[in-house]
């Protein structure tokens, strides 16, 4: 894993405006880690609810999976239709913006694909680029022409669209030259979209009928390069790819900080069990950095999760010596989990942490607190989630 010390550039020195550094979510002395490399052109990072990162390699027509436990990368979905942006629908299926197939598609859990949106008023879309899913299931996406040449264009404009759960495709705006990155404010009352080559970020008010209105210039970046993927955190800060790395803005349009990245940033997203890690796709590599912030609108499917929490049976079971314990939360919850032997003695503390809604995984290697391998036998995994307790029996065979 290659590490680059971040260069926290006071942007006020570059553009003549003051920077409110006190609000920066970037810890002093933080580092950006290169966690995967050697691809062709990466995009669309997405933290999967099963506890791993997926991302697109557009020219390779492949979605890759990065395992945080091992640091290894493997193929998640291929061919991907030259996918770019990725997201999740309400059921936890992966949504893909496919340049090659000129559509938004859905990948089911069995790996099969189905079209979500591919034509508007009988004409093919250009090449859907990025998307975000509202908590009610509506899919908002941008449709610039980056995946096609001008002779293939049928729409003759580059739109921002909404696809409803009922199957209706609605054009929201066609005023931008190259609409690209797209995301909501934490309360979903505002929609941010950037105009890539113009380096401008715009914001609209989301209306009760899900149209967008009151278009306003949020910020105009300077420097070489382009604007691309964007996300917000729970405090309403906006994170946008831009010249030199990731630009961080306060909700009132002030530049707070900039995360320097050694390659051209294409997109970014939140992940890890607490959603305080920002994953960044850039050039041929994927980077990550821990921040003093929590990602907003982590995934729409959390609204459909069971109330409280669910503890799954460990897998594999019986096991030797590695096993995985998965649990699902419907809301942010303080979790204490530990492993006990048959005499009721605690042998290992798995976690004592606050987790966001979603599916999470913990690993146990059949060792005690001192790292000593335990004897074969029956063990119990006990989870405490506020006022709820769940226990699962585990069988360890050496």
Residue ranges: model-predicted function:
Residues 23-39, 215:
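A short helix->beta-strand "capping" segment at the edge of beta-propeller domains
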Residues 31, 37-52, 79-103, 121-141, ...:
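Beta-rich, blade/repeat-based domains predominating
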Residues 58-59, 99-100, 146-157, 196-197:
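Short, solvent-exposed loop/turn segments at conserved positions within beta-propeller repeat blades
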Residues 62-64, 103-105, 158-161, 200-202, ...:
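A short loop-to-beta-strand structural motif that recurs across blades of beta-propeller domains
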Residues 67-71, 108-112, 163-167, 206-210, ...:
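Short loop/turn segments that connect beta-strands within beta-propeller blades
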Residues 199-200, 204-206, 212-215, 219-251:
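Loop/turn-rich, solvent-exposed surfaces of beta-rich toroidal or solenoidal domains
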Residues 301-315, 319-340, 349-352, 361-364:
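Glycine-centered coil/turn sites that cap beta-strands in beta-rich domains
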Residues 353-357, 363, 372-398:
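C-terminal tail/sorting-segment detector
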């Amino acid at each position: 894993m290659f590490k680059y010390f971040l260069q926290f550039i006071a942007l006020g020195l570059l553009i003549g405006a003051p920077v409110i550094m006190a609000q920066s979510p970037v810890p002093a002395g933080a580092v950006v880690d290169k966690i995967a490399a050697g691809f062709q052109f990466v995009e669309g990072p997405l933290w999967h609810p099963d506890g791993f990162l997926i991302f697109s390699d557009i020219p390779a027509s492949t979605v890759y999976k990065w395992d945080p436990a091992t640091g290894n990368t493997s193929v998640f979905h291929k061919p991907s239709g030259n996918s770019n942006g990725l997201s999740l629908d309400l059921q936890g299926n992966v949504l893909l913006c496919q340049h090659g197939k000129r559509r938004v598609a859905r990948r089911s859990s069995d790996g099969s694909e189905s079209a979500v949106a591919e034509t508007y008023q009988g004409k093919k879309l250009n090449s859907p680029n990025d998307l975000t899913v509202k908590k009610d299931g509506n899919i908002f996406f941008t449709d610039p022409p980056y995946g096609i040449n001008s002779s293939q264009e049928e729409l003759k404009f580059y739109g921002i669209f909404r696809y409803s759960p009922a199957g209706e495709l609605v054009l929201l705006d066609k005023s931008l030259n190259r609409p690209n990155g797209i995301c909501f404010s934490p309360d979903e009352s505002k929609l941010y979209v950037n105009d890539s080559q113009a380096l401008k970020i715009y914001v609209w008010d989301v209306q009760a009928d899900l149209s967008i209105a009151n278009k306003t210039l949020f910020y105009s970046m300077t420097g070489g390069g382009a604007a691309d993927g964007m996300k917000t955190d729970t405090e309403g800060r906006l994170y946008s790819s831009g010249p030199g790395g990731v630009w961080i803005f306060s909700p009132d349009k002030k530049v707070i900080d900039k995360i320097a990245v050694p390659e051209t940033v294409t997109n970014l997203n939140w992940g890890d069990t607490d959603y305080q890690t920002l994953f960044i796709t850039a050039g041929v590599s994927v980077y990550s950095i821990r921040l003093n912030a929590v990602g907003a609108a982590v995934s729409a499917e959390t609204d459909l999760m069971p109330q409280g929490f669910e503890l799954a049976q460990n897998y594999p079971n019986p096991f030797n010596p590695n096993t995985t314990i998965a649990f699902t939360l419907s809301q942010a919850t303080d979790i204490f989990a530990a492993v006990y032997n048959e005499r009721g003695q605690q042998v290992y503390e798995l976690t004592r942490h606050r987790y966001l809604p979603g599916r999470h995984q913990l690993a146990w290697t059949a060792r005690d607190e001192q790292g000593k391998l335990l004897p074969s036998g029956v063990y119990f995994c006990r989870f405490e989630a506020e006022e709820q307790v769940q226990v699962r029996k585990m069988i360890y065979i050496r």
